[in-house]
Amino acid sequence: MTRWQKVYEDGSPVRAEIVKGVLEENDIPAVVLNKKESVYQIHGQYEVMVPQSDVLIAINIVKNEITF
C-alpha cells in the first residue's frame, strides 16, 4: 500500500490541478484531494498528494519550478 503525503495546498482548485499536472509531467504520480466543506465552500483547501517516495523531488519542483 502506497502512503501519500501532502506537498501543496491552496484554496483554488485550478492551482492545485496545475501543480498536479506539472508533477505528472515530471513522472511523479499525484492526486488532488478536495478538503473543502461541501455546503458553503468557504472553509478548507485543495491538497496535492504524492507517494512518500517522491516527496522530496515533488517539494523541490513545487518550490522552484511553479510560480503563481
List PLM regions with ranges:
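Acidic/polar low-complexity segments and flexible, solvent-exposed patches
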Residues: 1-68
